[in-house]
């Protein structure tokens, strides 16, 4: 029996929606990264974008365990000399774009390269409860019931 290798034309992509209210960031990110890559499928092929389209709503209501909300620091560089900037997870979650915490967690679990960028394009994260993708009829995925550790009281 030969090893199965999916062709891009054979891949069928589903749309799933996840409500992130009260979910632990790292556990949510691992599950979503595997879904984006297609590793949950028996037909997974490493060089083909065979993952699903994932919509995450209520990303502003995610939970960080321990003291990570106050202590976790996100760095970026402006490109100028001495231009390293830092922000805590708390300041990002309370700021203008709270969904960036979830996006960065997932982005850092996806391989860097052309295929990884394409797979990250299948991710949509919204801070509030609404999303404009009702026409795609996304299936809800309840992450909280998969494992009791996935959910924390805020």
Swiss-Prot record:
Keywords linked to the UniProt accession: Ribonucleoprotein, Ribosomal protein
HAMAP family xref list: Ribosomal_uL13
InterPro entries listed in its UniProt record: Ribosomal_uL13, Ribosomal_uL13_bac-type, Ribosomal_uL13_sf
GO CC, alphabetical: cytosolic large ribosomal subunit
Molecular functions (GO terms): mRNA binding; structural constituent of ribosome
Family named by the database record: Belongs to the universal ribosomal protein uL13 family.
Highest taxon listed in the record's lineage: Bacteria
Gene Ontology BP annotations: negative regulation of translation; translation
Organism taxonomic ancestry: Bacteria, Pseudomonadati, Pseudomonadota, Alphaproteobacteria, Hyphomicrobiales
Gene3D superfamilies: Ribosomal protein L13
Claim: Cell membrane is one of the keywords in the record: no
Name of the protein in its database record: Large ribosomal subunit protein uL13
Subunit structure: Part of the 50S ribosomal subunit.
Function: This protein is one of the early assembly proteins of the 50S ribosomal subunit, although it is not seen to bind rRNA by itself. It is important during the early stages of 50S assembly.
Gene that specifies this protein: rplM
PANTHER family named in the record: LARGE RIBOSOMAL SUBUNIT PROTEIN UL13M, RIBOSOMAL PROTEIN L13
């Amino acid at each position: 029996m030969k090893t199965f290798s999916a062709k891009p034309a054979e891949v069928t992509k589903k749309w799933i929606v996840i409500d992130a209210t009260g979910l632990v960031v790292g556990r949510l990110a691992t599950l979503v990264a595997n879904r984006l890559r297609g590793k949950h499928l028996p037909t997974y092929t490493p060089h083909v974008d065979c993952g699903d389209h994932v919509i995450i709503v209520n990303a502003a209501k995610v939970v960080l365990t321990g003291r990570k909300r106050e202590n976790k620091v996100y760095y970026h560089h402006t490109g100028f000399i001495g231009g390293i900037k830092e922000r805590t997870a708390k300041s990002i979650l309370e700021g203008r774009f709270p969904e960036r915490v979830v996006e960065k967690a997932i982005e850092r679990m996806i391989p860097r390269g052309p295929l990884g960028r394409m797979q990250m394009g299948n991710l949509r994260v919204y801070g509030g409860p609404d999303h404009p993708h009702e026409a795609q009829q996304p299936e809800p995925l309840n992450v909280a019931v998969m494992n009791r550790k996935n959910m924390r009281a805020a």
